[in-house]
Every structure is written in structure tokens, then in C-alpha cells.
């Protein structure tokens, strides 16, 4: 059975976020992120793959649950743009929420995340 583009990238996103929940699954993150991965975080920091793995190894990303919605995918040959909203929770409280854009590239028959950009969503009162 062949997955639709939406199904494929929804599964990749699910795997990506699940790898960041609780104790990070560094092997999965290393596999999903391209070596030239670059993230522009909601706080304005620019972080490469090594920098992000270092943050996770140092337990500087305390998240036990990530929820997502408003998922959309646009695929262009060997590149896909995935947008959505993600909320990051710890100990039953929402820590922050972002609108995110993911850039995926198919290299050597494997989809990997090459870019991430997050924009903070203000907390509602």
C-alpha cells in the first residue's frame, strides 16, 4: 500500500515529535535530521544538527508531550514543506506553542528534515 503525501509526512512528523518527548530518542532524531539541518527557533536562535543534539543530550528541552494540529503539506518533487501548530507540555502544563514550518528533502531515497522554523504563538488569557 502506498501512502498519500499527507499520510507519509504526518507519520514522519509523528515520529519526529515522539522522539522529542520524555527522554529524547537521539538515534531516531539523528536519522530523521539531515547532516546539514538548520533550525531557526522561536526565540531567534539558529541551531544546526550537532547543536540541537547537544541541547537534547544536556536535557535542556524538558518536554513530555507534544500536541499538533493544523497540519498541511505541499510536496515539490524531492522537497516537501510541512506547516502546522505544535504545543509543548511538561508536567501537565503547556510550556509554549509555535507555528512551525518544516522542510523535508528526499536524498538517496530517504526523507530527512533539513530545516525548521518556529514562530511563537502568544498565550491566550
Language-model features: where?
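A beta-strand edge to alpha-helix "cap/lid" segment located at domain peripheries
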Residues: 2-31, 36-125
Amino acid at each position: 500500500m502506498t501512502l498519500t503525501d499527507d499520510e507519509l509526512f504526518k507519520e514522519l512528523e509523528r515520529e519526529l515529535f515522539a522522539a522529542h518527548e520524555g527522554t529524547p530518542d537521539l538515534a531516531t532524531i539523528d536519522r530523521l535530521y539531515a547532516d546539514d539541518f538548520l533550525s531557526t527557533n522561536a526565540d531567534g536562535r539558529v541551531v544546526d544538527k550537532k547543536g540541537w543534539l547537544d541541547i537534547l543530550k544536556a536535557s535542556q528541552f524538558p518536554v513530555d508531550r507534544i500536541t499538533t494540529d493544523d497540519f498541511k503539506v505541499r510536496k515539490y518533487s524531492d522537497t516537501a514543506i510541512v506547516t502546522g501548530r505544535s504545543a509543548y507540555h511538561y508536567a501537565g502544563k503547556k510550556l509554549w506553542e509555535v507555528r512551525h514550518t518544516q522542510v523535508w528533502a528526499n536524498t538517496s531515497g530517504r526523507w530527512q528534515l533539513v530545516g525548521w522554523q518556529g514562530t511563537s504563538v502568544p498565550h491566550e488569557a
